[in-house]
Amino acid sequence: MFQDEAGFGRINKPKHCWCRKGVRPRVPCHHIRQYRYAYGAVDPVSGDGYFLILPYCNTVCMNIFLEHLSAAYPDDYIILVCDGAAWHKSGSLRVYPNIELMFIPPYTPEMNPIEQIWKELRARGFHNEVFQTLDKVVDRLCNTIRCLTRETIRSITGRSWILSCFN
């Protein structure tokens, strides 16, 4: 499985959108620095995805994610491919017996296909939106994640160089 975290919050960036010819769309903006973080792990072969929304990107939250991931797949041995974030390599990180961490080289997000899942979630639920509360951000994030099917995850993350390793 490939793992990563992404921040979703109340700061929005206007994106292109459709409108009638001759009409300039109005897109409100917020610059409120409140975030929640989606921790996720995806399997490009099966299309399995596991996500958890947590308040921070740190070792404590990564430990919570690993605990839940381990419990969700108790009979599987998971090779979890991560980037080199500090909390992935912390001395206080608890790695469970059914999980082994592997790391992609530094500064190579293109090697982590879950990055495209974050892009898809933002496109589906966050473009040109203003959220009045952080709870509304979390609600939208949860609903958008729930709409991801196995087929969608497979099609977004199933890169040929990954799939060829399992054929």
Specify the residue positions occupied by each region the protein language model found.
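Short functional hotspots at interaction and active-site rims
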Residues: 1-167
